[in-house]
């Protein structure tokens, strides 16, 4: 979150910096990247359409490959393992605001996608810390003599004295094929231009966790605020504006002399919201399910896949006694944020046991999609075939003969149900005992379940064509795509006996003979 207005106030104090894509010698410094900030910045800077998860995956890979060419000593991506309870009300307010803002749906999925793609496909160094990433980023930057990429004004206030340290705001970056330029900030260099401690300015503007009775100046200009603080320090009246206790707290907030930082990294295999659940200091433990694109009048997409998550919670509970036997889930219900308390005192079960070892003859990307469709209720053959066409087309890299369409409300609901289900299956995979896992870790990280083979625009376009009576064979451009899609479809329908058949789209329509043909 950072300190309100501090980044804007101190923007002129940055110095230009440039990193060439073709350096003659390796750089003397490392690079530490705030994972969540990077994920959101890239999503918005690339103008990603909410349905194009695969396009976002490509953007993540391309940017990492560009950074790799800059020849830093090391590149580390650091992701959150959970938010402190002090941000609970902020989180509640933001969640509620987004319920009625369909444009913001799916955005939070960019963080687990970026983490999985970087760790698995890019083979980058990914670290997950047990709380927010920002303080651990500063800790690692000091340890590695690194530059930090982030979008958090808190980094302006860490007094790190290593030779090459600096904070570069992501929004200051100008990225080209020849390199990256931006603006670099250091606390010690900025401090030289002020006659009072910059932490006093931060405390005056309001640092996270400040006392509720602290009077914060929301309106004065930067110059006027600096004049007030400078005169107050000179006249020794500063405690009338910022108490001694609050200033001590702010200095401690930006101190890196915390022994917990030495042991704050945790399992990088799991996505942040699952890590947050496991490392929650609350009883019961809490999980915030990502918001999806759905109308407030519709049923919550997460309810359908609740049994999958229940088994995941039970597995965590059996392996970690301190986890407890209850979980509090936050999710959307109608047009408001809701929560429910779940008892998770059940026996341990692997993914394959939970899903009855279905589709075991398929490799994991195909099996995950088949599992997802099998767990969705009231599915019809057109919807199922459209998802399979989307998946196979992207998996094989084969285009389809499709036109842009306006998604129907029914199809939007199907997409959100699909995401909720595949996310819940991944949580079940995370919950397995790694020594007795039924799923190969290497196979799971070799593709990103939320982006490798998902582009929901293709689903909407395929569904639109199939609803008009078109055959899947008229949509695909090669026999391999058609054959693989049909094999997956047959396996699904053989197991999913109650799938609703709208029309026999796979059976080619016979051409009626005309009198001319008969003659």
UniProtKB/Swiss-Prot annotation:
The protein's matches in InterPro entries, at most eight in alphabetical order, are given as: Asteroid, Asteroid_dom, PIN-like_dom_sf
Which keywords describe this protein according to UniProt?
Answer: Cytoplasm, Mitochondrion
The record's Pfam families line, in alphabetical order, gives:
XPG_I_2
- Which superkingdom, per the lineage? Eukaryota
Q: Which GO terms describe its cellular component?
A: mitochondrion; nucleus; site of double-strand break
GO biological process, alphabetically ordered: DNA repair
Q: Where located?
A: Cytoplasm; Mitochondrion
Matching Gene3D superfamilies, A to Z? 5'-nuclease (3.40.50.1010)
Q: What is its main location?
A: cytoplasm
A molecular function GO annotation:
nuclease activity
Family listed:
Belongs to the asteroid family.
PANTHER family registered for this protein in UniProt = ASTEROID PROTEIN, PROTEIN ASTEROID HOMOLOG 1
Q: What is this protein called?
A: Asteroid homolog 1
């Amino acid at each position: 979150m950072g300190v309100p207005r501090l980044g804007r106030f101190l923007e002129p104090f940055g110095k230009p910096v440039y990193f060439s894509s073709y350096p003659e010698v390796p750089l003397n410094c490392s690079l530490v990247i705030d994972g969540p900030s990077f994920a959101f910045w890239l999503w918005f800077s690339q103008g990603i359409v909410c349905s194009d998860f695969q396009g976002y995956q490509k953007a993540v890979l391309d940017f990492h490959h560009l950074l790799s060419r800059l020849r830093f000593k090391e590149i580390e991506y650091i992701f959150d393992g959970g938010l402190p309870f002090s941000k609970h009300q902020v989180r509640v307010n933001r969640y509620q605001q987004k319920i009625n803002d369909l444009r913001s749906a799916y955005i939070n999925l960019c963080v687990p996608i970026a983490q999985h793609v970087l760790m698995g496909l890019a083979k980058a160094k990914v670290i997950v810390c047990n709380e927010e990433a920002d303080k651990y980023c500063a800790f690692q930057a000091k340890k590695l003599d690194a530059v930090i990429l982030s979008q958090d004004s808190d980094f302006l206030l860490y007094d790190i004295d290593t030779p090459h340290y600096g904070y570069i705001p992501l929004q200051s970056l100008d990225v080209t094929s020849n390199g990256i330029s931006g603006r670099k900030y250091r606390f010690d260099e900025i401090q030289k231009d002020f006659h009072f401690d910059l932490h006093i300015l931060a405390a005056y503007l309001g640092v996270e966790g400040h006392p509720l009775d602290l009077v914060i100046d929301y309106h004065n200009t930067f110059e006027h605020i600096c004049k007030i603080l400078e005169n107050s320090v000179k006249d020794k009246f500063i405690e009338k504006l910022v108490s001694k206790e609050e200033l001590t707290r702010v200095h401690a907030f930006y101190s890196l002399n915390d022994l917990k930082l030495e042991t704050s990294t945790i399992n990088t295999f799991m996505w942040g919201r699952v890590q947050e659940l496991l490392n929650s200091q609350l009883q019961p433990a809490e999980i915030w399910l990502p918001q999806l694109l759905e109308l407030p009048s519709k049923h919550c997409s997460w309810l359908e896949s609740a049994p999958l998550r229940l088994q995941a919670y039970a597995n965590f509970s059996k392996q970690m006694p301190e986890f407890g036997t209850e979980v509090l889930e936050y999710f959307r219900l109608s047009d408001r944020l809701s929560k429910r308390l779940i008892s998770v005192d059940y026996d341990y079960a692997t993914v394959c046991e939970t899903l009855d070892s279905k589709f075991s003859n398929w490799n994991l990307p195909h099996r995950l999609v088949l599992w997802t469709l099998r767990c969705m209720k009231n599915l019809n053959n057109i919807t199922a075939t459209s998802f399979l066409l989307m998946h196979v087309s992207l998996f094989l890299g084969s285009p389809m003969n499709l036109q842009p369409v306006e998604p129907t409300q029914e199809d939007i609901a199907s997409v959100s149900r699909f995401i909720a289900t595949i996310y819940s299956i991944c949580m079940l995979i995370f919950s397995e005992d790694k020594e007795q896992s039924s799923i190969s870790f290497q196979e799971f990280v070799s593709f990103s379940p939320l982006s490798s083979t998902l582009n929901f625009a293709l689903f909407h376009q395929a569904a639109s064509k199939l609803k008009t009576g078109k055959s899947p064979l008229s949509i695909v451009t090669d026999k391999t795509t058609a054959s693989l899609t049909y094999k997956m479809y047959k396996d699904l329908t053989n197991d999913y006996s109650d799938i609703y058949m709208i029309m026999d789209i796979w059976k080619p329509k016979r051409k009626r003979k005309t009198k001319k043909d008969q003659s």
